[in-house]
Amino acid sequence: MAEFPFEISPMFEGERVRKEGMFVELGGPKSLGLELVRAKPMDEIEDDKVTIVGPDLKEMEEGKTYPWAMIFNIGGELVEPDLESVVERRVHDFINYCQGIMHLNQRYDVWMRVSKDTAAKMDSFEPFGQAVMMLFKTELPFIEKMQVTFYTEQAEVEKQLEEAKAIFKARDERTKDLHDEDVDVFYGCTLCQSFAPTNVCVVSPDRVSLCGAINWFDGRAAAKVDPEGPQFEITKGDLIDAEKGEYTGVNDIAKKLSAGEFDKIKLHSFFDAPHTSCGCFEVVGFYIPEVDGIGWVNREYQGMAPNGIGFSTMAGQTGGGKQIVGFLGIGINYFYSPKFIQADGGWNRVVWLPSMLKDKIAETIPEDLKDKIATENDATDIESLKAFLQEKGHPVVATWAAAEEEEEEEEEEEEEVAVAAAPMMMPAAGFQMPAMPMMSGGSSGGIKLTFKNAKITIDKMIISEKKEKK
């Protein structure tokens, strides 16, 4: 192995470069970040070449954030365009093998940091680029030639980003006419387990990976060329619930790969055994109980959602490979799925989106709902959201009256509990029963005691009327 100014090992996966230990930040929420892999003819690739357009590492100022784009060109007899996204997703793996260099997210959301210790050992991104390409060709031998260009100049990054978005869109559209019921196998991905050990990403025709980078065709291509790699085949097994997207094969793999943490995953459910969330997801969904609706916030949105929480905080609550009822991480392309959270109302349950996300996915939002889904321009808190939904006649409003009626009925059923029939449970030491008003029993005489949501155990109770002293 060639000599590099930093150590290279899988042991560094999951290493975090904190702000206080950071030399520079590349991309991320404060700037632009991109990674893209392109299949090219062999004669168009200068093997192992690293090109830097813009300031190199030694020209960067400590503590600053810079725009960042990585464009990898790959070639080989077995290399084809279908493999681009597969190779692209491994960028996350191999960069994180490099000590002191942190990589998060994917596509147009890339966020990297270089530690002070690592920056002190190298004055250019060139050895970093050579190290990553060495790892690619070692782990994926079908790549025979490879070169990379790093962009750190704002205008160039913006240009590369626009071109890349068109490429990503074309990739995503390939699965539009293929659905879960049309195939016998799904695909799994464990790339994010270095950061989220119990995450089990299941990719089906109707559900893109959480990071948005792997669709069903990409999973198939990856499993074919690298059978021992992080993308693999999942036999669907028997269908348990079509609406929720539950299959025996998916449940089996969920239990196995989460080390028993979860025993089922329902692909199209928000509330019942939802898909696990890693941390690389593009969008996080959050339940708003006050309106019985679901809001969604994307990684790029810097403001607060109506619940008073921003993306980063919600991502922390949702991620880590957990199965959190009330929060759900997804890839943006899942919005285009005909099975989008169909078990819980689909689009009829969506009540809030940041305007930038709403504009981005406008073509897939049902026409009759476009004006009924609020943005930060319409609602910034729960009260204003509720008022907006009522004014626009959003479908969730109809559920509010039904829920209130059901609650009233439950309260009436619990209204009266006879003392003699009350379930008994010994109160804690020092517990004192609250004073209860004496009520006239009318023609029937006696008193009435009302206990709500109470479990009381008493060996003996004596209730007597206290007579006034004369």
From Swiss-Prot:
A Pfam family: ACS_CODH_B_C
EC number: 2.3.1.169
Any single biological process term in GO: methanogenesis, from acetate
Cofactors, names only: [Ni-Fe-S] cluster
InterPro entries: ACS_CODH_B_C (IPR045822), CO_DH/Ac-CoA_synth_bsu (IPR004461), CO_DH/Ac-CoA_synth_bsu_3_sf (IPR038571), CO_DH/Ac-CoA_synth_bsu_arc (IPR023432), Prismane-like_sf (IPR011254)
Keywords, comma-separated and alphabetical: Acyltransferase, Iron, Iron-sulfur, Metal-binding, Methanogenesis, Nickel, Transferase
Co-factor binding details: Binds 1 [Ni-Fe-S] cluster.
Pathway named in the protein's UniProt entry: One-carbon metabolism; methanogenesis from acetate
Gene Ontology terms for molecular function: acetyltransferase activity; anaerobic carbon-monoxide dehydrogenase activity; CO-methylating acetyl-CoA synthase activity; iron ion binding; iron-sulfur cluster binding; nickel cation binding
SUPFAM superfamilies: Prismane protein-like
Binding site for [Ni-Fe-S] cluster: 189, 192, 278, 280
Reactions that this protein is recorded to catalyse: Co(I)-[corrinoid Fe-S protein] + acetyl-CoA + H(+) = methyl-Co(III)-[corrinoid Fe-S protein] + CO + CoA
Family indicated by similarity: Belongs to the CdhC family.
PANTHER family the record matches: ACETYL-COA DECARBONYLASE_SYNTHASE COMPLEX SUBUNIT BETA 1 (PTHR42281:SF1), PTHR42281
Quaternary context: Monomer. The ACDS complex is made up of alpha, epsilon, beta, gamma and delta chains with a probable stoichiometry of (alpha(2)epsilon(2))(4)-beta(8)-(gamma(1)delta(1))(8) (Potential).
Function recorded in the entry: Part of a complex that catalyzes the reversible cleavage of acetyl-CoA, allowing growth on acetate as sole source of carbon and energy. The alpha-epsilon complex generates CO from CO(2), while the beta subunit (this protein) combines the CO with CoA and a methyl group to form acetyl-CoA. The methyl group, which is incorporated into acetyl-CoA, is transferred to the beta subunit by a corrinoid iron-sulfur protein (the gamma-delta complex).
The name this protein goes by in its record: Acetyl-CoA decarbonylase/synthase complex subunit beta 2
UniProt source species: Methanosarcina acetivorans (strain ATCC 35395 / DSM 2834 / JCM 12185 / C2A)
